[in-house]
Amino acid sequence: MIPDKLQNIMKQDGVVAIATLGPDGPHMVNTWNSYLKVSQDGRLFIPAGYMHKTEANIAYNPNVLITLGSSKVEGLHGMGAGFLIKGKASFVLSGADFDFMKEKFGWLRATLAVKIESATQTW
């Protein structure tokens, strides 16, 4: 479900924006492209150090929008490619998915797991 071009973007320097919607409106948080990992079943894993507002919003509404890109990857109109990911998210506080990410990011308090519903190249 994760296109090769998106996987290539994830290896590059860049910022990821994660949007959630809670009872008091939208909220955005950022992380780095290189922090994103893919599970064996195709879910997107994101280390959460803080993200307390994001966690509260996901408990209220699990829908997330994620954007990321890189100027170093060939896109639809030359150099520069980006994606919009839509999915359902949950916070994982223990178990195999948590341990997988904790090994890579010792500072995390939780794993943000996203079941991808669509990944659309936007640029």
Regions found by a protein language model. Name each.
Residues M1-W123:
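Binding-site signature for planar aromatic cofactors or substrates
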